[in-house]
Amino acid sequence: MKIDLNADLGEGCASDAELLTLVSSANIACGFHAGDAQTMQACVREAIKNGVAIGAHPSFPDRENFGRSAMQLPPETVFAQTLYQIGALAAITRAQGGVMCHVKPHGMLYNQAAKEAQLADAIARAVYACDPALILVGLAGSELIRAGERYGLVTREEVFADRGYQADGSLVPRSQPGALIENEEQALAQTLEMVQHGRVKSITGEWAMVTAQTVCLHGDGEHALAFARRLRATFAEKGIVVAA
């Protein structure tokens, strides 16, 4: 069994360099919620050094709230903003002799695109316009995954080690109790259940079916590095190969 392990990087966390030795894919902030040209360049350099797959992590234009504010923007605006961000990272990656492999939206752009078909379509269209060979990463079973498939993109369905799930397979909003899993044992058990058995227990007790092709580790979590090491060790024990 193989699984991709990804982390959101270039967002100002001190643990980026170490996380890049533990993950197989990096989603690099492109300036709209965090990061800038220098951090993008530094993250790309480290990712190439560690053999980690490079991806763009575009966001709504919301540095003030770290891309976590809901926005209702015209699809053409979202298309242009997404293309702008992924194009910038693609150029920075190419300039350093690397290849950009995937795109994963950030924060509220990701969450809204999971449910809003027009928004999902604008993102998928931007990815396709930039490079049809790019992989589109989205919440398992979401509108974003369906939009990517409509454009003929390779999609990668994502699950979260440290997030609570609702009965419909969507994430519990960060504003609600149960959104974040702080207990390491619980996060580890949830991850293995999703990867090995394709299901996750919701905060209300029901099982939701999920397709786990990539697992997200949040690099900004307090125990991110320790948990990443433990997850890698557990995967190795279970014969699960970590690779993009």
Swiss-Prot record:
It catalyses: 5-oxo-L-proline + ATP + 2 H2O = L-glutamate + ADP + phosphate + H(+). It comes from the Bacteria. Pfam families: LamB_YcsF. GO terms for molecular function: 5-oxoprolinase (ATP-hydrolyzing) activity; ATP binding. Keywords: ATP-binding, Hydrolase, Nucleotide-binding. InterPro entries: Glyco_hydro/deAcase_b/a-brl (IPR011330), LamB/YcsF/PxpA-like (IPR005501). The keyword Ubl conjugation does not apply. Its EC number is 3.5.2.9. One of its GO terms (biological process) is carbohydrate metabolic process. Gene3D superfamilies: Glycoside hydrolase/deacetylase. NCBIfam families: PRK05406.1-1, PRK05406.1-3, PRK05406.1-4, PRK05406.1-5. Forms a complex composed of PxpA, PxpB and PxpC. Belongs to the LamB/PxpA family. Catalyzes the cleavage of 5-oxoproline to form L-glutamate coupled to the hydrolysis of ATP to ADP and inorganic phosphate. This is 5-oxoprolinase subunit A. The gene is pxpA.
